[in-house]
């Protein structure tokens, strides 16, 4: 299906796995229509979408035409709804809210990835806009954010957004950029784990995105170092039950393991996903609630 009748000059929307957002604990195995928007408050030297981040060549999505596309795709098994990404969706919030309302009227879900520009206040004023949220952290210190040209308070805004979303019953997952083998990044990772353990809840998914600033892009298929593997192991062991290397495709650390019995309950090294080891979010081996929201139509 072509979507050019409602897309922006940036490019057409496209259908992707919800794992590509990435969201691993919300409707795993389902697909979403990805809506990209331009602009970003940060200036990351390793940005893998610099044209999108800087582009001003954009026009709002047409809500009625988007709704028609969603209704057409809705007949496909496992189609969940739309995913706002980019870019920073908060820069076009009125369009996001208007379009998301149409998607919900069509009986589908809305997920959104943000660098922290979506504030707790925006979420409070538009409580039914988003069903699931990925909050992307570029580090976990004000110093790191300053080096990326961040507006003042963006890290604190991101933390407040996560807490507000959880309180509102929105599904939340987190992402942290990791410059590989950098001790300072390891320290920020530990600080983020402590925040999750103290102020949030054990079991919230945390995605590590491996980056290589010297190459100027995020690593999608590069080798995984012992440093990264140690971070995942320590996170799973100490504070957070679910830590993933989400952009290192095919790695064992993309799998969802039960934090109690350590069984692999979602294997992401193969397609389609095998969800036979989890029922209603419960580990099929030991009965532990692993916090997965499953598509009720999933066989």
Predicted regions located by residue number:
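Iron-sulfur (Fe-S) cluster-binding segments and ferredoxin-like electron-carrier domains
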Residues: 1-6, 49-59, 265-272, 290-297
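Conserved Radical SAM active-site core
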Residues: 2-132
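Hydrophobic faces of well-ordered beta-strands that scaffold small-molecule active sites
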Residues: 33, 82, 110-112, 133-135, ...
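Short glycine-enriched, charge-decorated loop/helix-capping segments at active-site entrances
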Residues: 51-56, 147-152, 220-221
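Conserved glycine-rich "GG(E/T)P / GGGxP" loop and the immediately following alpha-helix
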Residues: 74-102, 144-160, 166, 176-192, ...
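Short, well-ordered coil/turn segments that N-cap beta-strands
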Residues: 78-80, 106-108, 129-131, 168-172, ...
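Conserved radical SAM core fold
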Residues: 89-91, 117-123, 132-151, 171-183, ...
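Auxiliary Fe-S-binding modules of radical SAM enzymes
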Residues: 167, 180-299
């Amino acid at each position: 299906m072509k979507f050019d009748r409602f897309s922006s000059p940036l490019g057409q929307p496209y259908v992707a796995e919800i794992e590509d957002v990435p969201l691993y604990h919300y409707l795993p195995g389902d697909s979403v229509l990805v809506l990209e928007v331009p602009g970003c408050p940060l200036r990351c030297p390793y940005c893998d979408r610099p044209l999108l981040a800087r582009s001003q060549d954009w026009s709002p999505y047409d809500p009625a035409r988007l709704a028609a596309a969603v209704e057409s795709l809705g007949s496909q098994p496992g189609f969940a709804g739309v995913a706002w990404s980019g870019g920073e969706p908060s820069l076009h919030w009125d369009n996001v809210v208007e379009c998301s309302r149409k998607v919900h009227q069509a009986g589908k879900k809305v997920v959104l990835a943000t660098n922290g520009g979506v504030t707790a206040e925006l979420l409070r004023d538009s409580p039914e806009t988003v069903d699931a949220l990925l909050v992307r952290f570029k580090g976990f210190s004000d110093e790191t954010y300053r080096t990326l040209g961040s507006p003042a308070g963006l890290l604190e805004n991101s933390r407040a957004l996560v807490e507000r979303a959880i309180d509102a019953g929105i599904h939340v997952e987190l992402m942290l950029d990791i410059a590989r083998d950098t001790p300072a990044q390891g320290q920020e990772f530990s600080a983020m784990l402590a925040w999750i353990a103290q102020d949030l809840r054990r079991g919230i998914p945390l995605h590590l995105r491996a980056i290589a600033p010297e190459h100027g892009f995020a690593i999608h298929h590069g080798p995984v170092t012992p440093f990264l593997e140690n971070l995942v192991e320590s996170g799973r062991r100490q504070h957070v039950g679910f830590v993933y290397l989400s952009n290192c495709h095919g790695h064992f650390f993309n799998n969802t393991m039960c934090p109690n019995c350590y069984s692999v309950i979602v294997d992401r090294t193969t397609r389609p996903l095998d969800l036979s080891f989890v029922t209603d979010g419960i580990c099929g081996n030991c009965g532990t609630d692993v916090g997965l929201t499953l598509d009720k139509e999933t066989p």
